[in-house]
Amino acid sequence: MSAELKHLVQRFYDEVLNAGQLNVLDELLTPNAIYRNPALGLPASVEGAKQRLAGLRSAFPDLRYTVENITAEGDRVVVQFVLEGTQHGEFLGIAPTGKTVRTLGMTSYRFTDGRIAEILVLADFVTVLRQLGVLPVLTATPP
């Protein structure tokens, strides 16, 4: 079962996040699935997830997720990923900068009856905001 769940999550990355095929969500997610990404706002339904992911793709048209690690246990799969993209559209109210961002994140997936019922994304958006020039870059100072 773990191999099957990992395969479904890999499809989520390959087909939905990297290829932008949002219609695949209808196949991979339960009808009442919840998508939570605190950086992008309140929890969303399947349709809300499609809108948020489309907005992210609009802001970063070359957006690319690379799965660094994938672990499955019972009805859960956890992924560690690297996200990279260049901002060519508005993102969280920030006008396009043309800057490329790279950050790390983790996502937890909970399955019900072989489909994703819940997604929780935790990504380092502070680093993204620094790379976009919205927040100052912290530098170490000698003691």
Language model features with spans:
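C-terminal and inter-domain tail/linker signature
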Residues: M1-P143
